[in-house]
Structures are given as structure tokens and as C-alpha cells.
Amino acid sequence: MAEPSVESSSPGGSATSEDHEFDPSADMLVHDFDDERTLEEEEMMEGETNFSSEIEDLAREGDMPIHELLSLYGYDSTVRLPEEEEEEEEEEEGEDDEDADNDDNSGCSGENKEENIKDSSGQEDETQSSNDDPSQSVTSQDAQEIIRPRRCKYFDTNSEIEEESEEDEDYIPSEDWKKEIMVGSMFQAEIPVGVCRYKENEKVYENDDQLLWDPECLPEEKVVVFLKDASRRTGDEKGVEAIPEGSHIKDNEQALYELVKCSFDTEEALRRLRFNVKAAREELSVWTEEECRNFEQGLKAYGKDFHLIQANKVRTRSVGECVAFYYMWKKSERYDFFAQQTRFGKKKYNLHPGVTDYMDRLLDESESAASSRAPSPPPTASNSSNSQSEKEDGAVSSRNQNGVSSNGPGEILNKEEVKVEGLHVNGPTGGNKKPLLTDMDTNGYEANNLTTDPKLAHMTARNENDFDEKNERPAKRRRINSSGKESPGSSEFFQEAVSHGKFEEHENTND
């Protein structure tokens, strides 16, 4: 089946350097029909192939020598075998005195000459065969190009490197990836002379260290047997010691220390443990009530800093005893009562500031704020209004209709004394308090100026009449807070102030 050439023209357009969209013709679309019968025929044809002949051919080729097999598939004897390549590599390794560059140049030049000679001979053969049959020349030339080996050592080495890289090998990381342990004189810091606390021949510790255990002097099996014998019951135990223990082996430090003092003699160590006056298990001495109270106060003040607790609160005990008592105290009912009173168990964020879970902290703060806040009943509007109305009623009853009080004329209330103090009950009052009623009318004009203009005087008279009618009606209660909205509670201040101001105006007119 011949393949269409690239240069052949297509119905949609000729193939040039530029890309064009493929436009199929009508004839191509007519034949573009997928028939399933053709697939079935192809499957039947493939099923008719005989695999037995292929197996026989493979078996015959397996017994065939390599030279015949190469010639069967069209390869000449010039192709080097793997065995020959290994022999050549061994010969090259033996020649250490020769220069590698000269060998490569000479080898490449000599092989290039051989290739030129072979090319010239090949060209002569091609010219002779071209006269006889042009198709044979093309096939021979293609086969020669395929079969021609690469004889230059430079290319051979590259091919070997490529073959080695293609093989599966373990990944070896680079040296930069590896971590180097910085140990040695070059990584040590140079400490100045005055910084060091100790001299060259001075000992850091005044007393010698005491050996407590050496695991190399006695095998582990004997140590286990010794610990079992040391923890064996005698039947004379009382109290807590009488409680049966598990089958596990306890690491009895006192028994091991006795074994070290006896030069790892197990029998002598067991005898000393049994007849020693000091108990094998030291019980914690009882703490007094004062010590317990001081310890709890230290926990409140310093947290779990047992060094500060011992130094400032419980000086009669050591730091180790404070730690041991803390774990016993935490399992007692005294700790539960202490935690309820001080909430010591939940204030972990004070001791560990790195904790990022602040939910417990927020709950604790909200509960403590709610408990510390004393519940006080809020002042109602009715109470404040009643108290203010009682004050105003007492002030009005102390005066007669002419505005003169029972005590004398010197206690007449001026207009400026009436001030609105209830307008800002819910908010801050202004710094400069101005009197509500002055010599101005309700529209904001002064009375002296209004007398000169008759029109303005008529308007003020009408406004006064309207104001009298409004005062006769029942006053609506109104409360004004700092934001300017109406709110109940301070309406009496405003209404009483207006009523008293009007009452004083009537007194002046009567006078």
C-alpha cells in the first residue's frame, strides 16, 4: 500500500510551508463509511494465522550461531560483538603510557580514511549497479547506511555512557544534599580568657562524683533475678506494703545501689536489704496544715515554679519534697476544693504562653467577670419621674398664686434658676449649661425688640395663646438621650421646667 507523498496536492489545497485547514471533498465523505463487516473480516483473517510456524522459526533461530543470525537479518560481520568490545576495553586499559588524546585523534583520522575509501568504493559500486537496476542501488545504499557501524572511539564512548545511564541504578544523592556533622577544631568557638570561670587546673566540683550503678559489671539476667529476690514478700508487710503488686519487675534504685556498694555481690546485697533499719520504700512525711496552706499560696503566686515556692513559702521542705507532695495533693479532695475556689486547673495559659487555644481563656474571663459584677437593679423611668415630680410639687406648694413664698419675698425663683438637668440623663451633660427660659419668646426673639415692630408683636401674641392652649392639654412624656432620640424617663424635667417658666411669666404680668 503506497503512502501519499507530502508534495501531492489535496482537494482542500496544496501542502506548502504555511499550514492550511483540511477541507475534505464530497467524494471523500462518500467513502467515509464505517462498516463493521470489515472489522469482522479482519479478525477472521488474523485468526487464520498459524502460530506454530513462528514458534518453529524462533526455535531454529535459537540454535543458530550468532554470525548466521546476523547475516540472516542483514547485518555484516563488521558489527562488533559484546565479547570483542570487552576484549578491546581490556587492551585499552593495559596501555597506560600512551596519550589518550593522540590515540583518539589518530584513531579518528585512520577510521575516517577507511570510511572515505569505503565510501569511494561504494560510490563506484553504486554507479555500476545504477546502470543495471536503479532500484537495487537505492536499497543497497539504504542498507549500507543502516549497517554502517560507528568506528570512532569518541562516539563509541558516548554510546557507552548513554547505555550506562539508561540502566537502572540506585539513586546516589549529591554531596551538597548530605548533612555534615560539624565536629572538630575548625568548628569550635574561641572563648576569650576572661570569660571562663574556672582556671586550667581547677576542678569544677569540689567533691568527687559517686558511682550509683555500673551495668557492665554484672550481666542483665543476674540483675533481673536479684530484683525479683529483692521485691519478694516476707509476709510481714503492713499497710500499703501489703497490697499485692504485678508480675512486672520494678526498678528498685535502693536495691541496685546496695548491690553497687557490695561490689555486685547479690547475696550480701540481699542480706543488707532485709536487715537494714532504713525501709526499702521511704514514706513521705506528713505535712502540717500550715505547710499545706503555704504551698497552696505559693501555687497561686508562682504557679508550678517549685524553686520559688520552696524559697519563699515552704522553707521547711526541699524542692523534691514539694514536687512529690504536689502530685499527691493533686489527687486529693483538697485539690478539688482549691481548683473550685481559684480555678487553678484551667489557668494553663498563664503558665504556658505558647498555647494558641484561647477558648478556655475567654470562658474563664467571662465567668469571672460575671461573678465579680454585683447585681444592681437598673433605675426605672417611673421611679425617677416620681422623685422629680415630688420635688417639683414641694416647690410649687411653697409658693402662693402671686409668686410670693410663705417665708418672704426674698425667695422668689428667678428664670435663670430653672435649668434642664434631665435632658441628658442617659448621656454626658454639656460643659456650659444654659438656662432654658430667658427674655426670648418661643421663636427665639427677644421681647424688647419685638415691641418695636407691630407685626412681630402680633405674631408673638398669637404664639403665646397657642402656648397657653398647649399647656392646658395633658403633657406628653418625652425623654431625650445623648443621641437625640426620644426615651422615657426625663419627660417630667422638661415639662415641669416649661410649666414653671410659664407660671413665672404670669407672676411678672400680675405684678
Swiss-Prot record:
Residue ranges of domain ELM2 in the record: 179-277
GO biological process, one term: chromatin remodeling
Self-association state and partner proteins as the record states: Interacts with HDAC1. Part of a complex containing at least CDYL, MIER1, MIER2, HDAC1 and HDAC2.
Biased composition (Basic and acidic residues): 17-36, 57-66, 413-422, 461-474, 499-511
Subcellular location: Nucleus
Protein's recorded name: Mesoderm induction early response protein 1
Function: Transcriptional repressor regulating the expression of a number of genes including SP1 target genes. Probably functions through recruitment of HDAC1 a histone deacetylase involved in chromatin silencing.
Tissue-level expression: Ubiquitously expressed. Isoform 1 is only expressed in testis.
Designated gene of the protein: Mier1
Transmembrane segments: none
Keyword annotations: Isopeptide bond, Nucleus, Phosphoprotein, Repressor, Transcription, Transcription regulation, Ubl conjugation
Organism listed in the record: Mus musculus
Residues recorded as bearing Phosphoserine in the entry: 10, 140, 159, 165, 366, 368, 376, 482, 487, 490
